[in-house]
């Protein structure tokens, strides 16, 4: 199915108010927002109503954190985690993915390619194919974070279903009042088996 057909199906479901599609997308995006905040990334907005433009569903420019991080490898690993955490949570569902969710996953794959290209551009690896170890580490951290923050993701997903759209200050306030302290470094350094 083409990306345009998937977008049209997602728009149609959105117009009909399909709550299952909204909840699936809300969980996917909530996981990404939680990962972003745990990484110290700023999230300008998140919306479950912007199916026509999946890039607007979550607006977070992780590349802007490069100066603050001063560690390109760590930033790239965390960016991979940010991109893939939604897909990890999607895999837990036994239902077939909605058209809206498939559109978001396609957009995540585009975002993953951007992370790969940044790793090459920043001279961390010689080619895009060499980014797999960085991707693997980011995926592991995202998986570990989902084990630590499952209720937080569910709570934010519920809030997104109610609010439909949240902007940066709303997200920061919500996160500050709901999230427990957690050092992402602890999860990155953990030797626990993840599969």
Label for each model-derived stretch:
Residues 2-195:
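Soluble catalytic regions of large protease machineries
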């Amino acid at each position: 199915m083409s990306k345009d057909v998937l977008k049209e199906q997602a728009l149609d479901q959105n117009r009909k108010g399909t709550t299952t599609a909204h909840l699936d997308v809300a969980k996917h995006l909530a996981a990404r927002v939680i990962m972003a905040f745990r990484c110290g990334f700023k999230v300008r907005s998140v919306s479950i109503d912007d199916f026509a433009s999946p890039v607007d569903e979550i607006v977070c420019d992780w590349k802007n954190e490069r100066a603050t991080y001063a560690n390109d490898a760590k930033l790239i690993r965390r960016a991979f985690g940010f991109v893939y955490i939604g897909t990890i949570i999607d895999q837990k569902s036994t239902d077939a993915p909605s058209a809206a969710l498939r559109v978001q996953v396609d957009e995540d794959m585009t975002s993953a390619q951007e992370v790969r290209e940044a790793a090459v551009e920043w001279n961390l690896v010689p080619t895009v194919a060499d980014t797999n170890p960085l991707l693997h580490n980011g995926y592991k951290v995202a998986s570990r974070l989902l084990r630590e923050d499952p209720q937080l993701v569910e709570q934010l997903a519920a809030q997104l279903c109610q609010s439909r759209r949240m902007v940066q200050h709303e997200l920061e306030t919500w996160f500050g009042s709901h999230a427990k302290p957690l050092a992402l470094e602890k999860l990155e350094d953990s030797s626990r088996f993840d599969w």
